[in-house]
Swiss-Prot record:
Protein known as: Early E3 20.3 kDa glycoprotein
Family under the similarity heading: Belongs to the adenoviridae E3_20 family.
Organism field: Human adenovirus B serotype 11 (strain BC34) (HAdV-11)
Function: E3 proteins seem to be dispensable for virus growth in tissue culture cells. They are potentially important for virus growth under special conditions; E3 region may help adenoviruses to evade the immune surveillance of the host.
Keywords: Early protein, Glycoprotein
Amino acid sequence: MAFLTALILVSIVTAAHGQTVVSIPLGHNYTLIGPPITSEVIWTKLGSVDYFDIICNKTKPIIVTCNIQNLTLINVSKVYSGYYYGYDRYSSQYRNYLVRVTQSKTTKMPNMAEIRSDDNSLETFTSSTTPDEKNIPDSMIAIIAAVAVVMALPVICMLLYACRYKKFHPKKQDLLLRLNI
């Protein structure tokens, strides 16, 4: 049980550590920089059909160009969202990216009369600086998830132990194990 707890904790910390979050507007190209190389970087997209899908040799559903180190995503669409992992075959160097595809927002240019009236209203308006509550860092979410898992596992272990103890030792009565399960 301790091994399972350690495995879950290590996987959560590993997923949160070293990951670069990239937001790319629809229709743009973007280059993911690979790790320092000794031979050639292999790029995979996690969560695709083959789970670890080597993407430099494929043409569908995403179109990319690969050189020895970097991966360029071409004409980005929603299909490109996901985790990209680039690693050097002969060393332990790797880079981890979380790609998020965003809608590009277009706005109309205001005329000069609107700008002047906005300048006057800005002089009278004072705002307090508050942090953006909708933007929670991924590392904080990973830490909270790890704490919740670590707190839940001992409770689950105690319940399982109590059930198994009662099943195999029905004649022994312990005050702590008087569960009606």
